[in-house]
């Protein structure tokens, strides 16, 4: 027996017994008492699950989140790193909102995934007016905006020549003199007073200003360290649809330059930048993707179709299998659960992406799934369906898990098994040295990336590593029905042993590994 496990058996069990174990605890099961190996596995599993479970139960590192309604957006807001938009486009943002409701926004574009080589910058000026709280996205505020001027300035001669030609092709006659564009000169793409407009040449839209959310938190419970985050609406994954899309979730947040995380080096660099001095972020090597260990959400995540959730992935690199639970909620701070999904399957070896710099491509297969309704509304929805289209007809109860593999998924949730998805991942380290795992952004049209050509070119919010290795899948099988939410009605459970294995599903058109 390894020394970490001996330590667990020596010190963890007395602590657990002092904490208090109920009759339903696996550690007090007669079979566990009579089999030391089973006891040891339970202890090791409890130790690692407690870390991941604790992180899911205490999102934002346990910080208390305050949401401003209506939001106060006046100030200077900046990206926290190099962002990836569908295309792919590599971008950093610097937005200023003024007391008279006008704004000036910089969008800095780059030729690589580390945002070290600026190619061009968009300078956007306009006016914004906050409206009512969103009827669609709880916790968000709707807004209207009006553009006054959009300019572009190129940072190399090659980019200036290419972009000028692109504008000429997209909007023939737009450039009056027809001469080539040059570096470090600002050119109009939109001017309100004369009606000139050719923003589609760069797939530009500012509809992100139509959905706004501001969050405040005190890092590490330190009242002297306030961090403010501005969430703006998401960008359509199809660049040709950006002008017609109304946001239904959020982009990665901007931080207030006045109240930002002091560990954010990129924040300080972007804050000092302008169109003539675009931010150049510190170069970093791409981390090799090794899908192993356990990963959990850092915050309550928002998805299109009014979904709030947390995720927990488990990867077994010894046999290329994966597991997960997606925990769904009805509120934007993930306090009121609606249902959870447990899924498992296999994944391919990773191949470096030729399309998205820094990305690694995988193929995921899902062949097993369980569903747990966590409120009466979801249970009723599942019971509406006739026949064996989603588990046993009319048998759904709140807090009781059912296997839907034998019914080839669940029609009510839009799940069909078996299922294959074409994924992309990348890995980074944050300022605290923690590993972050990004997987592909879901298509904005609600479809699934079930063909290679539909593979994402941008990413979702990252997961953080909560355990560097994972127990074998067969060791966890007995606990696959455990719930993050706490006690199911009529059951006595012990919180440290609740499996936080979570994978995500939209209620109307659920997509595997969302």
From Swiss-Prot:
The chain crosses the membrane at residues 493-512. Residues 513-514 are cytoplasmic. Its main location: membrane. Residues 438-460 are annotated as: Disordered. Residues 1-26 form the signal peptide. N-Glycosylated. GO terms for molecular function: identical protein binding; Wnt-protein binding. Negative regulator of the Wnt signaling pathway. Inhibits Wnt signaling in a cell-autonomous manner and functions upstream of beta-catenin. May act via its interaction with Wnt and LRP proteins. May play a role in colorectal tumorigenesis. This is Protein APCDD1. It comes from Homo sapiens.
């Amino acid at each position: 027996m390894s020394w970490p496990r001996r330590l667990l058996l020596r010190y963890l069990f007395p602590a657990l017994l002092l904490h208090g174990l109920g009759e339903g605890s696996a550690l007090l099961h007669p079979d566990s008492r009579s089999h030391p190996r089973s006891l040891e596995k339970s202890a090791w599993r409890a130790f690692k699950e407690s870390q991941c479970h604790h992180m899911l139960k205490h999102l934002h590192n346990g910080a208390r989140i305050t949401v401003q309604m209506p939001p106060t957006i006046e100030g200077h807001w900046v990206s926290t790193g190099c962002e990836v938009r569908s295309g792919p486009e590599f971008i950093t943002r610097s937005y200023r909102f003024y007391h008279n409701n006008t704004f000036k926004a910089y969008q800095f574009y780059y030729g690589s995934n580390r945002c070290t080589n600026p190619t061009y910058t968009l300078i956007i000026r306009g006016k914004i007016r906050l409206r009512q709280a969103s009827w669609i996205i709880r916790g968000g505020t709707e807004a209207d905006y009006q553009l006054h001027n959009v300019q572009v300035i190129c940072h190399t001669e090659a980019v200036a020549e290419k972009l000028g030609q692109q504008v000429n092709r997209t909007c023939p006659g737009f450039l009056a003199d027809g001469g080539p564009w040059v570096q470090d000169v600002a050119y109009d793409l939109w001017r309100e007073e004369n009606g000139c407009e050719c923003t589609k040449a760069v797939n530009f839209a500012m509809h992100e200003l139509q959905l706004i959310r501001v969050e405040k938190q005190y890092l590490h419970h330190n009242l002297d360290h306030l961090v403010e985050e501005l969430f703006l609406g998401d960008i359509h994954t199809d660049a040709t649809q950006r002008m017609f899309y109304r946001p239904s979730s959020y982009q990665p947040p901007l931080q207030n330059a006045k109240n930002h995380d002091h560990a954010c080096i990129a924040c300080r660099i972007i804050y000092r930048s302008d169109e003539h001095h675009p931010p150049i972020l510190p170069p970093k090597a791409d981390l090799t993707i090794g899908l192993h260990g356990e990963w959990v959400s850092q915050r309550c995540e928002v998805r299109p179709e009014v979904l709030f959730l947390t995720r927990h992935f488990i990867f077994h690199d010894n046999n290329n299998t994966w597991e997960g639970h997606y925990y769904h909620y009805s509120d934007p701070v993930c306090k009121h659960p609606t249902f959870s999904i447990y899924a498992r399957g296999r994944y391919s070896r990773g191949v470096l992406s030729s399309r998205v710099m820094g990305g690694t491509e995988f193929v995921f297969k899902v062949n097993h799934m369980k569903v747990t309704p966590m409120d009466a509304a979801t249970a009723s929805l599942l019971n509406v369906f006739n026949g064996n289209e989603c588990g046993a007809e009319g048998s759904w109860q709140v807090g009781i898990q059912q296997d839907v593999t034998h019914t080839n998924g669940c029609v009510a949730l839009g799940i069909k098994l078996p299922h294959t998805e074409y994924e992309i991942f990348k890995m980074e380290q944050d300022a605290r040295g923690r590993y972050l795992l990004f997987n592909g952004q879901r298509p904005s049209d609600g479809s699934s990336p079930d063909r290679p050509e539909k593979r994402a070119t941008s990413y979702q919010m990252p997961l953080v590593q909560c355990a560097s290795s994972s127990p074998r899948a067969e060791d966890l099988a007995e606990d696959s029905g455990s719930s993050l939410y706490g006690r199911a009605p009529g059951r006595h459970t012990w919180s440290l042993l609740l499996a936080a294995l979570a994978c995500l599903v939209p209620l109307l058109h659920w997509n595997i590994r969302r």
